[in-house]
Amino acid sequence: MTDVQPQLSAEPSARRSGAFPQQQPISAYGLIGDMRTAALVGLDGSIDWCCLPRFDSGSVFASLLDPERGGSWSVRPEGKWTSTQRYLPRTNILETTFRTPDDGIVSVTDFMPVSEDGLPSGPHPEIHRRLRCSRGRVMMNMVFMPRFEYGARTTRVESLRAGLFASDRTDQVLTLSSAKPFEWVIEQSTATARFELEKGEERWLVLRYDDDDIHPVGRYESVRKLDNTAAFWQKWSSKVRYKGPFRGMVKRSALALKLLTHSDTGALIAAPTTSLPETIGGVRNWDYRFVWLRDAAFTLAALDAVGHYREADQFMRFLKKVCRHEGGGHLQIMYGIDGRRDLIERQLDHLSGYRGSRPVRVGNGAVGQLQLDVYGEVMETADIWRRNHEMTEGTWRVLQGLVEWVSRNWHLPDSSIWEVRGEVRHYVFSKVMSWVALDRGIRMAEELSLEGDTAAWRIARDTLHAEIMDRGWSEARQSFVQSYDDEVLDAATLAIPMFRFLPWNHPRVHSTVRAVARELTTVDGELVYRYRQPDGLEGEEGAFSICTFWLAQALAMIGDREKAERIFRRMLRHANHVGLYSEEIDPASGEFLGNFPQAFTHIALINCAAALARLEGRS
């Protein structure tokens, strides 16, 4: 598998057919970012999603969620064209190449600059776009349509000598600078320009946020910033430690996860988007631009598995910060990028949603749920982290508080890893991860001679283990089930041996893996659903990509390497043209569903690839 993934092409006449002619498939995008925020760039040269100045800020481009009101910034040839898109090797710098019927070729290179040490290149987020014609003469069309605060605020766009100035009449400002002046036509706060590029010609465009001054484009040093940005990403990706046959996809997944980190706070977000639907036209549309402690912990474990440890150190600082504010060992399941607790969910009724999928939500109502598994994932990550870092008294005090909380509260019902918005229950995976929290706390306390009531923790751990084996197992299904005393299968039970609750060679592990493979997969056995029963929400959902990778890993670990690798390779073919995945896949069409790109999916890809490599004697 090479670093550059197979590419797709886009024909505008075909893309513009159907019920939603202005919205591309979710899979038709690449992601750029500077580890403060990110932007989705389509195969058609349009930036259709970008929030500034942070991942969880209001959007300035959101045509992904409403092509009329959301805003976008497109650059592409006039008339018919085809396009391909790729990342420059070992980077998060995106290149979209357009070909016209008369043999013209123009490439658009998009990036958000970072310094050579991975920090933002300055106080103001920037997007740099290089237009380069390598063949023929091509008439280009640019449309600049910013819309602040999810399109809810009035935007004013003005043409100045050095470029465009956009504001929302309050405190938000965008500037767009260009190497040569364009003849802008501005109507209804949308600026358009036609211009011609000929072979050998190159133009730079620079978008800058929150700077009242607009400068000639040369002042932004795009060439130097491109070199520095490429140098950082190439150096970072060169440290990915994986020698198996899927190196290209493992590197791409690691690079995608790195884009979802916040360099200032150490936070790791679940995805950079909100409200991309789990079913087209459905209501399961959620905001993922926050720090789920579970997802962050899984991300750090995956990055650790491929040799990147610094991210764990940064996240531990974030974790200590939120724990100091919480007190008593209690954790929310998610926090804002800066550690804020208040993530009130609201609906943006003025937006039509992706392909008519409403409501569009910002904030997340699941923030108040109890999800016991979070404690286990955090403690598992801490156990991994401490192998390469010194355990300070302050850090242990935080972790000790978490273990104490679990020892007192593991018996409570919760909402599960799947954030069920219905009745709380005794979910088996939640109980297993509570066991993990206790087990890792005991291990760290004993191995490092740290303070803690390990005797009480051990009693709680062993009691919980026995209870799970009794009430979490179904003799009728010959499988671990979703919650105590029911018969519902749940793909989350595939992860039980991954956290060493039971060894991989245990008969109940083998039987559970076989049951999931038999009953929770699509007809062809290629994709995996989370579960099959109603969960209290309207509508349906697609197959969950993390669950498919979990099944592949589990099959490999119980000895069915052939089937495991077949499922894994099929999942690799489901990646989009630049190697990215969303949360879910529509089994009928193969189209992406859910927020994109999704950390969970890339985490599971890395872990599965690493497991396959270990079984082959590689690392």
Where are these regions (language model features)?
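Acidic, mature catalytic/reactive cores of soluble proteins
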Residues: M1-S619
